[in-house]
C-alpha cells in the first residue's frame, strides 16, 4: 500500500504542474489507462489472499477516484484559463465608433408622390386608387373622349384587345369614385400610367397624380387658388403662376399651368427654352357630360380637376435633366436622394 500511496502522490504532483490539456491527457493514460500504473496495481489483487482482496480493492478504487478528480479539476481550470485568454485577445472595445451600414432610401419619384399627397391631405383631400388595366369605357367614354379622338390611336395607347388597355391617365379613378359616391368629393389619384412615348422627357410608363373636387358652388377661382397654393407649398417658394387657355375633352374651360422657371427665376435658360416659364400641369372645370355619365347632376354640382406628372415635378425639384435617369436603377444617381 505504500507503493499505492506513492503512485497517487506522484500522479497528483504531475497533475498539479501540468499547464496543457494535451499533457493532462497523457498523465491520465499513464496512470488510469488500460496499461496505466494504477490499473496494473489493480491486476495484482489476484496475488493476494482472498480475505485481503476486498479491502485492498477498495483502497485502489479510492486512489483512482482521487487521481481522476484531480484530473477533472485541473482540466476545468486549464480550459477556463484558455477561454479567458481567448476572450482577452478577442476583446471588443465598445468605445470605438461603429462601422457605418449602407442603408437604402426612397426613390425620388416616390418622395415626390408622397410630398404631393401630403400637400393635398392637409387641405382635406383623400387618396384614391384604381386598376392599371382599364376598360375602354372608364378610360375614354366616361371622360367625354369620343371614338374618333387621337388619344385612342394605337400609337398612343397600349391595347390588350378592343376593350381592355393600360390606362393612359389616372382619370378613370375619378370616374369610379363619382360612380360610387355622391358629392362632396375631394380626392387625389396617384399611380402609374402608360403611353407609347419614350425620349429625354417622356417614358412609356410614368407616374401621374390627378385631383378632383366636386361640390356645390365650385368655380374656376377655387381651382386657381388650390393650384397656386399647392405649387408654392411643393416648391417651398413664392412662385409666379400663370394659366393658359387649353383644351381637354373632360374639362371646360381648360387650362395649362406654367410656373416661373425654378432654375433661372424667370430670366431665361436652357431648361425653360429662354421663356422664363415651365409647364407643370393641366386643369379645368369638370365637363357637364362627365358629371352626367357618373349620375351627378351638373345643374346642382360643379367640379374641377387637375393632373400632373410626378417625374416632371421631380425633375424640376431635384434639378434632373433626363427623365430616363429615374428608371436606370443606377445607385450612383439614386444614392444622392437618401
From Swiss-Prot:
Top class in the EC scheme: ligase
Domain of life, per lineage: Bacteria
Cross-referenced Pfam families: Phe_tRNA-synt_N (PF02912), tRNA-synt_2d (PF01409)
Tagged with keyword Aminoacyl-tRNA synthetase: yes
InterPro entries registered for this protein in UniProt: aa-tRNA-synth_II, aa-tRNA-synth_II/BPL/LPL, Phe-tRNA-synth_IIc_asu, Phe-tRNA_ligase_II_N, Phe_tRNA_ligase_alpha1_bac, Phenylalanyl-tRNA_Synthase, tRNA-bd_arm
Cofactor(s) in the UniProt record: Mg(2+)
Main location: cytoplasm
Annotated Gene Ontology cellular component terms: cytoplasm
EC numbers for this chain: 6.1.1.20
Metal-binding as UniProt keyword: yes
The entry's keywords: Aminoacyl-tRNA synthetase, ATP-binding, Cytoplasm, Ligase, Magnesium, Metal-binding, Nucleotide-binding, Protein biosynthesis
UniProt remark on cofactor binding: Binds 2 magnesium ions per tetramer.
Binding site for Mg(2+): 252
An example Gene Ontology biological process: phenylalanyl-tRNA aminoacylation
Location in the cell: Cytoplasm
Catalytic activity: tRNA(Phe) + L-phenylalanine + ATP = L-phenylalanyl-tRNA(Phe) + AMP + diphosphate + H(+)
GO MF term list: ATP binding; magnesium ion binding; phenylalanine-tRNA ligase activity; tRNA binding
PANTHER family: PHENYLALANINE--TRNA LIGASE, MITOCHONDRIAL, PHENYLALANYL-TRNA SYNTHETASE
Subunit structure of this chain's protein: Tetramer of two alpha and two beta subunits.
UniProt record similarity statement: Belongs to the class-II aminoacyl-tRNA synthetase family. Phe-tRNA synthetase alpha subunit type 1 subfamily.
Protein name stated in the entry: Phenylalanine--tRNA ligase alpha subunit
Organism: Pseudomonas aeruginosa (strain LESB58)
Amino acid at each position: 500500500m505504500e507503493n499505492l500511496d506513492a503512485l497517487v502522490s506522484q500522479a497528483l504532483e504531475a497533475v498539479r504542474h501540468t499547464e496543457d490539456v494535451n499533457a493532462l491527457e497523457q498523465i491520465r493514460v499513464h496512470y488510469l489507462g488500460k496499461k496505466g500504473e494504477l490499473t496494473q496495481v489493480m491486476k495484482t489483487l489476484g496475488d493476494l489472499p482472498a480475505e485481503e482482496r476486498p479491502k485492498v480493492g477498495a483502497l485502489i478504487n479510492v486512489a483512482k477516484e482521487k487521481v481522476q478528480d484531480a484530473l477533472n479539476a485541473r482540466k476545468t481550470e486549464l480550459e477556463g484559463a484558455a477561454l479567458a485568454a481567448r476572450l482577452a485577445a478577442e476583446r471588443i472595445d465598445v468605445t470605438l465608433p461603429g462601422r457605418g451600414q449602407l442603408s437604402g432610401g426612397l426613390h425620388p419619384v416616390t418622395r415626390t408622390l408622397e410630398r404631393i399627397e401630403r400637400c393635398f391631405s392637409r387641405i382635406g383631400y383623400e387618396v384614391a386608387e384604381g386598376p392599371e388595366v382599364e376598360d375602354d369605357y372608364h378610360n375614354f367614354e366616361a371622360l367625354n373622349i369620343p371614338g374618333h379622338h387621337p388619344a385612342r390611336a394605337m400609337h398612343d395607347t397600349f391595347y390588350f384587345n378592343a376593350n381592355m388597355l393600360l390606362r393612359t391617365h389616372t382619370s378613370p379613378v375619378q370616374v369610379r369614385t363619382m360612380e360610387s359616391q355622391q358629392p362632396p368629393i375631394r380626392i387625389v389619384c396617384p399611380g402609374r400610367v402608360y403611353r407609347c412615348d419614350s425620349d429625354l422627357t417622356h417614358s412609356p410608363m410614368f407616374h401621374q397624380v390627378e385631383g378632383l373636387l366636386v361640390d356645390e358652388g365650385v368655380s374656376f377661382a377655387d381651382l386657381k387658388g388650390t393650384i397656386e397654393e399647392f405649387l408654392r407649398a411643393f416648391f417651398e417658394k413664392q412662385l409666379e403662376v400663370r394659366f393658359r387657355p387649353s383644351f381637354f375633352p373632360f374639362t371646360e374651360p381648360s387650362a395649362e399651368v406654367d410656373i416661373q422657371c425654378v432654375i433661372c427665376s424667370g430670366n431665361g435658360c436652357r431648361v425653360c427654352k429662354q421663356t422664363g416659364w415651365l409647364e407643370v400641369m393641366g386643369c379645368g372645370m369638370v365637363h357637364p357630360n362627365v358629371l352626367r355619365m357618373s349620375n351627378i347632376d351638373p345643374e346642382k354640382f360643379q367640379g374641377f380637376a387637375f393632373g400632373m406628372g410626378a417625374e416632371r415635378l421631380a425633375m424640376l425639384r431635384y434639378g434632373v435633366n433626363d427623365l430616363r435617369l429615374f428608371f436606370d436603377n443606377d445607385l450612383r444617381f439614386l444614392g444622392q436622394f437618401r
